[in-house]
């Protein structure tokens, strides 16, 4: 009798041919098998959202495939690895406290006119799901965006995507629009910034065109509203957007909103709007980790047909950590610099251009490990192992210390680089090396030699 893992591997392979690629990659591939006994296949989803998605839409397909492969009836259940924070998901709108109980009667959204593809600003052709690199920082938001694109107005309405500047909120929003237009070319997809919504409202008031303004926005099948944080303090704009939101939501039209912060943290935002925005799913996008940044650079290089050495990708990914726009901008500058000067695309040639302030050159974690192992005469494998041999332990501590100085990795990420060490271990290592440097001339000389090889300055980032 085959094991659960064996059965799930076969089922997953069968589903890959049956489901769309985005659906398979987002919901099936990251899901594992928990157990299989007495005809029950228990699956383990990576997060609550995936679990909900599998149960509500994909469970019959999975069960059918499992039954077909095993040759007997198989019941499928889905568990989630982690619990979704209560503040991020409100399953029932009645659970949200509404402060405004004397709202005017809500208007129904008018039926959409036929034969018109788009009636608000066109979407950027580059912002599609296929060009979005999914990392741990964005997996939830990507999965939610895909679910909304496939079934608008059903699962999460509204979908509120929040995150810092340049992390991919606009990309995901517009990808939803592109996806819907591919499925339904006649869909009325409206992508609009909050500034444009406000300006349109002002013009409508000046020209006595409020009815046309309302019809225009409330006829959308899918409305994508960017930078909603700029609505703060604009009382009349908030009033009009509130009624537009209600008209669309009650008609089952999908609303997607993006902001640089959660609804509750937008100052001077009406409580009734906060409540509406929290009715669906709030999906957060964090800054990408090193691996995701490298994947983003590799993806962009492939799209632009550029051949880049891996150490250069590692260098740029380690040097620019705040957002994706900055990261891609650095790559563009590096390529332009090499093209203009005729220099090869190497870390040595582009690093001075990417670090014009002379405040120290960032390095990749792999470079730190390589140079430390070279100077301290241990192997990189030993440094990342659990061995406690004194020479290896000291080299490992030096590596953690210099990685903290020369890269933008957090303490937990440094620990991961050294074989999954805890962040407290990294903190201890840094403290130990700082103490020893003041009393051990030999160690100080070795550390300085590594610094020189890596071009790391001596300023501590603690």
Swiss-Prot record:
Chief location bin: cytoplasm
Keyword Plastid: no
GO molecular function: ATP binding; ATP hydrolysis activity; DNA replication origin binding; lipid binding
Sequence segments annotated as region (Domain IV, binds dsDNA): 339-462
Region Domain III, AAA+ region, residue ranges: 122-338
PROSITE patterns named in the record: DNAA
Pfam families: Bac_DnaA, Bac_DnaA_C, DnaA_N
Biological-process GO terms, alphabetical: DNA replication initiation; regulation of DNA replication
Renumbered residue ranges of the record's region Domain I, interacts with DnaA modulators: 1-80
Subcellular location field: Cytoplasm
Keywords: ATP-binding, Cytoplasm, DNA replication, DNA-binding, Lipid-binding, Nucleotide-binding
Example of a GO cellular component annotation carried by this entry: plasma membrane
Region named Domain II: 80-121
Residues engaged in binding ATP: 166, 168-170
CDD domains recorded: AAA, Bac_DnaA_C
UniProt remark on domains: Domain I is involved in oligomerization and binding regulators, domain II is flexibile and of varying length in different bacteria, domain III forms the AAA+ region, while domain IV binds dsDNA.
Complexes and interactors: Oligomerizes as a right-handed, spiral filament on DNA at oriC.
Family per record: Belongs to the DnaA family.
Biological function: Plays an essential role in the initiation and regulation of chromosomal replication. ATP-DnaA binds to the origin of replication (oriC) to initiate formation of the DNA replication initiation complex once per cell cycle. Binds the DnaA box (a 9 base pair repeat at the origin) and separates the double-stranded (ds)DNA. Forms a right-handed helical filament on oriC DNA; dsDNA binds to the exterior of the filament while single-stranded (ss)DNA is stabiized in the filament's interior.
Protein name: Chromosomal replication initiator protein DnaA
Classification of source organism: Bacteria, Bacillati, Cyanobacteriota, Cyanophyceae, Synechococcales
